[in-house]
């Protein structure tokens, strides 16, 4: 698509696409298309520097919304029709059963709504991953009922996405690894943040404000989140716990091997390629400990409130009134987007935001008397 856009632009012809994704993607998608000026519209979340530059230069339209709301907004018709769904699969059958790979995102909704489906059959993900997914779409109003998840391990749907096989217009075989981003090494600052959070949670247990059995944890992405998870796992005063989150990252898998994480429910395995290979090589161990759901379910505020989550996410900036800016640098330039942090924070039993005290090599302060931009009012 990027090459086609470049060719058409060289001829003086317009060529751009609108794009819906689950959340952020790798450079081969967001980066390539942004550099080719091939994106007209993008939602809901991104983390690519070239796409970010295009958005802030107003070269592409961007809709920043809570991840849990995207699938239903598509079904409601708020965002227009879907012409083509391009989906990655570990397996696809002749009768239209698509087995997702390491992420689900908005897969069931776009497959049902798209006029045509192109399946990228990636042999890096074994067919045996089938059974690690729980595919469920809620009914739309006025027929919607509760989402019947009462523990993170509850299964409520199918192990694959079922589509009309006539809509599948192509199957492309690939052998591509995930574009897993490397996080910065843990340092004294991130480890101190992790220890502070772990110590705080222990104090809440001792004070009786958290049950001694503990509650499920939701954690954002990044080296601070990894440090928090590591410190929680190392603190013996915190019992082994479940995870109900959007992205499952390396630290969760390591704690699972140690017996400190009992079960993890999420939308995607956002782990390094070394860890994804380890998971696939030991599916007998991991398959009954990991469940991947559509983000409409993994991030659903109803479920977060019912489970009583501890939500731990990252902020760009916070002020002394409890307001959080997690989207706009200096209040004006879009960073990545709200992502899933608002889904969880607004409904968690206990919500925590973490960030180092300073950024940009100490040139900017993360905690202010009044934030430059308000993403969430966190009181």
Model-predicted segments: where are they?
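Conserved alpha/beta enzyme-core scaffold
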Residues: 1-374
């Amino acid at each position: 698509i990027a090459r086609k856009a470049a060719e058409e632009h060289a001829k003086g012809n317009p060529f751009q696409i609108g794009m819906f994704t689950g959340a952020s993607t790798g450079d081969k998608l967001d980066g390539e298309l942004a550099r080719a000026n091939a994106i007209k519209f993008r939602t809901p979340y991104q983390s690519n520097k070239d796409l970010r530059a295009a958005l802030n230069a107003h070269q592409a339209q961007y809709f920043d919304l809570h991840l849990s709301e995207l699938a239903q907004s598509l079904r409601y018709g708020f965002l227009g029709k879907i012409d083509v769904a391009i989906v990655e699969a570990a397996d696809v059958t002749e009768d239209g059963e698509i087995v997702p790979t390491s992420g689900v995102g908005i897969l069931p909704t776009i497959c049902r709504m798209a006029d045509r489906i192109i399946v990228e059959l990636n042999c890096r993900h074994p067919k045996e991953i089938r059974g690690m997914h729980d595919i469920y779409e809620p009914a739309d109003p006025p027929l919607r009922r509760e989402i019947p998840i009462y523990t993170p391990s509850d299964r409520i749907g199918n192990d694959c996405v079922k589509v009309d096989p006539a809509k599948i217009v192509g199957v492309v075989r690939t052998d591509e690894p995930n574009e897993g981003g490397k996080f910065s090494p843990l340092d004294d600052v991130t480890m101190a943040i992790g220890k502070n959070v772990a110590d705080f949670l222990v104090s809440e247990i001792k004070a009786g404000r958290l049950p001694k059995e503990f509650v499920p944890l939701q954690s954002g992405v990044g080296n601070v989140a990894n440090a928090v998870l590591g410190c929680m796992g190392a603190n013996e005063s915190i019992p082994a716990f479940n995870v109900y989150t959007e992205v499952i990252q390396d630290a969760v898998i390591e704690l699972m091997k140690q017996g400190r994480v009992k079960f993890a429910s999420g939308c995607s395995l956002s782990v390094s390629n070394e860890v994804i290979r380890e998971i696939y090589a030991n599916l007998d161990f991991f398959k009954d400990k990991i469940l991947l759901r559509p983000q409409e379910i993994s991030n659903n505020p109803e479920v977060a409130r019912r489970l009583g989550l501890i939500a731990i996410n990252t902020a760009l900036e916070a002020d002394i009134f409890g307001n959080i800016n997690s989207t706009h640098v200096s209040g004006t330039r879009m960073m990545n987007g709200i992502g899933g942090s608002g889904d969880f924070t607004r409904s968690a039993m206990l919500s925590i935001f973490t960030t180092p005290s300073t950024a940009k090599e100490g040139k900017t302060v993360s905690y202010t008397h009044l934030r430059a931009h308000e993403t969430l009012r966190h009181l």
